[in-house]
Structure formats: C-alpha cells, structure tokens
Design a protein with these regions (language model features):
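Vicinal oxygen chelate
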Residues: 13-17, 69-122
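Short, charged/polar surface micro-motifs in flexible loops or helix N-caps
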Residues: 49-53, 60-62, 75-79
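Short acidic/glycine-enriched loop/turn segments that link adjacent beta-strands
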Residues: 38-42, 63-64, 107-111
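N-terminal beta-strand motif that seeds the catalytic metal site of vicinal oxygen chelate
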Residues: 1-20, 68-72, 127-140
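Acetyl-CoA-dependent GNAT
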Residues: 56-62, 93, 100, 105-106, ...
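Core segments of cupin and vicinal oxygen chelate
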Residues: 11-53
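Conserved beta-strand in the GNAT
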Residues: 53-57, 114, 123-126
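Active-site beta-strand termini and strand-to-loop segments that position acidic
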Residues: 45-49, 115-118, 128
C-alpha cells in the first residue's frame, strides 16, 4: 500500500469573508470551500498551484500570528537558474502590487517576498533551492 501525505496549514483570521477577498482577488488563490455556522463563515480553504491554506476564525486569540513559507518551483534550463528565479520573483511582485498588495523584500538565506494578510499573518514567497543551484552552477 502506498500512502501520500499532504499538509493543509491553518491561518487564524478575524473575518473569513475579508480574508477570502484578499487571497482570492489579490493573491490569485481559488476558494475551494467554506463552512458556515448560523449563517457566518467560520472556516474556509483556498488553493493556488498546489498550495492549500485553511482559514479559521474559531480561535480569536491566535489571529495574526501565522507565518507561512510558500515555495515556488521554477523549471529552467541548466545555467539559467539565477536569472529565471529573479524574473519569476519580480513577476510575482508585479502581479501582487498591481492588485494593491504591499510587498516587501525579505531574506532567509535567500531572497524572498514578504506579504502580510489583513490579519497580520506573514506569507514568505521564496525559492529556497536558489542558492543551492547557484552554488552548483558556480562549481562547474
């Protein structure tokens, strides 16, 4: 028997509808589902290109304390990794900023883009393998 594991991290938010608006209309995620109690959304899920996030408004004391790494993969020809990664990050930044998203530069041993959602949860968009690939290319 073969098993596959996957994770669906939960970010805690104050208002599901406001959060869905941000992730769907500004970050380009698609709403997968939402759960309501007494006519009010309390849990929802979004996804984009294999990244799945769940939002919950059920624990107010945890709102805005999330940090999520969203690693993006770039298929590139050998010798072109650095330029392709920089181009992909720049395109993502333009996509977000065009939709009114505040994007900051960050560093975690490699370049990343930092976006905060309306509740203060931080999203780090990165290519963690960039430095490894760059070192491998330089060694050749």
């Amino acid at each position: 028997m073969s098993e596959e594991w996957y994770a669906r991290p939960v970010l805690f938010v104050a208002h599901i509808d406001r959060t869905l608006d941000f992730y769907v209309n500004r970050l380009g995620f698609a709403q997968a589902w939402r759960y309501e109690e007494n006519g009010k959304a309390v849990v929802a899920q979004v996804d984009r290109q294999g990244c799945v996030l769940i939002f919950s408004s059920q624990w107010p004391d945890k709102v805005g304390k999330g940090l999520m790494f969203i690693s993006l993969n770039v298929n590139v020809a050998q010798g072109q990794f650095g330029a392709e990664v920089e181009s992909a990050l720049d395109k993502l930044r333009v996509e977000f900023e065009t939709k009114g998203v505040d994007v900051k530069d960050g560093w975690w041993g490699y370049r990343l883009l930092v976006v905060c959602d309306p509740d203060g949860n931080e999203l780090y968009f990165n290519y963690p393998e960039a430095d490894e690939a760059r070192v491998a290319e330089e060694a050749q």
